Amino acid sequence: VVIGSWCLEGYKSYFGRKTPLTTLRTRDIDFLVPRPTRIRTSVDVPALLEDLGFVTDFHRGGYIRLIHPELIVEFLVPERGRGTDHPVRLPQLGINAQALRFLNMLEEGTITATLEGVRVRMPHPAAFALHKLLIAPRRQGRPSKQAKDRDAAVAVLEALRAHGAIELVREHLASMP
C-alpha cells in the first residue's frame, strides 16, 4: 500500500484531474506492509530492485531503505502494542521495516488509483486525511512537517467535500478506536 505524499498524486486520478490537489511529492516513496505475518510467498525485494539500479541502505535505526538517484523506497509496518525503536524484520521480503503508530488506520478500506501510469493500492482519502491530522501535532520539533501534514489533510478533505463524500470522513472517524 503506497502511503505518504505520493498519495496526493494518486488521489488526483481517483477524484479526477480537475481536483485542485497540489502535488509536491518527496523523493521518498513509503510502502505500508499491512499484515506482515500473512505474507506467504518469499520475495527478495532488494535483489529485485537492484536490477533497476537501487542500492540497499541500512538506516541508523536498523531498517533498510532502497536508494536510487531519483527515488528512495522505505517500508513501514503498523506499530503494535507498546512499540519499539527496533526495526521489524520481514525475512519473507528480505527487508527490515520501520514500525510507526497509527498506520493501521491506513490499511483498512484501501482504494486503487493510478500513479505514474501504474495501478496501486493506497489509503482511502478520508483515512489519509484523518491520519495526517492525527500525526501532525506529534511531529515535535519539525514544524515544516507539521504544516505539510495539515495542508495535505485539508486539501484532501476539501476534495472529498467537493465530490460530496464528506460523509465518508464521518464514517472513518466513527470507526476509529
Residue ranges and their predicted role:
Residues 1-177:
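Compositionally biased terminal segments of proteins
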